[in-house]
Structure formats: C-alpha cells, structure tokens
Amino acid sequence: MKTILCAVLAVMLGAAHALAADDALGPTANAAFLADNAKKPGTVTRPSGLQYRVLRTGFGRRPAPGDIVRLFYNIHLVNGTLVDSTTPTLPASLAMDTVTMRGLSEALQLMHEGDRWQLVVPTALAFGVKGQGAAIPPSQTLVFDVTLVSAAPPQPGQTVGENPFSVWSNGREAGGAITIHP
C-alpha cells in the first residue's frame, strides 16, 4: 500500500512540476508580461498591441514597401528562452514584402536605419494559436531585440537570403535565396 501511495504521489508531483513549467508560457504569463512591459519607461504600445522600446536611435531612412532590409535580431519567449537569432557578424537580409509576421512588419516600417528596438509582439501579431513547430509553442508573445542595419530598394539581380519569418509563417522548409528580377 505504501508503495502504491508513493508511486501516486510521485506521479502527482511530476504533473505539478510540468504544470508549473507550462505556466511560465501559459496565457496568464503572456498577459502578465505584456501588462508589466507596458509600464516600463519608454515603452510605446501601438493600437495593434505591438509594444516597442527604442534602445538606440538611428538616423537613416525608413524601409519602404519592396525594400531589402538587413537586420540583426534575437527572439525570446516571455520566459527568456532564445528561439532564434542571427549570427553576431552576419545580418539577415530579406525583402520587406516577404515579412508576413504582422508585428515585425509593423515595427520595421516605423524604424530607421541604425535603430535598435526591443519589440514585444503579442501572439495575434506573431504566430497565433498555431505556434511554430517545437521552438514556439501556441499562443506565445515574442520578445525581439532588433537592429535595422540598412534598407534600400532592390537592385536588379540582387540576391537576398531566405526570409526566416516567412518560412515560419508559411510552415514550409527553407527554400534558398530570393533573386530580384527587373
């Protein structure tokens, strides 16, 4: 009897620990993170729900539709787990028209070359209830650290890297580079 009771107790404790871990990424934790972040000095909350804070001000141009942007980024979940990043020396290059993550697209249109922003992207502006594979569970708020290196109209024959954000949003595998044709 004692053995059975100990086994039941062990299972219950394991389930409690699993629930506690899930709570760190659950709806309550995501909502609390958004509410707390909105109170931080310098945080701007847009009507869409996107939150951003300017960490460094640049003075270059803003991206226009169709531009090729180069950026450095780190993406974390609200519990601090890093889910994606560029390498420290090689920015991602992507066409603005291929950015399908609404929160990132909205922020990039507001930024200037040289800006470094912290973005807090609510789930509705990120990957929603579907999440993105094993890295991003469903209904997650994402925290970006983004530096916009450059924004320029595409040049004929210019090749840019695969847009990691469109790959995630479309749920397909990376398909190589994108070439701009006149």
Report the location of each language-model feature.
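Cross-family detector of peptidyl-prolyl cis-trans isomerase
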Residues: 2-9, 18-182
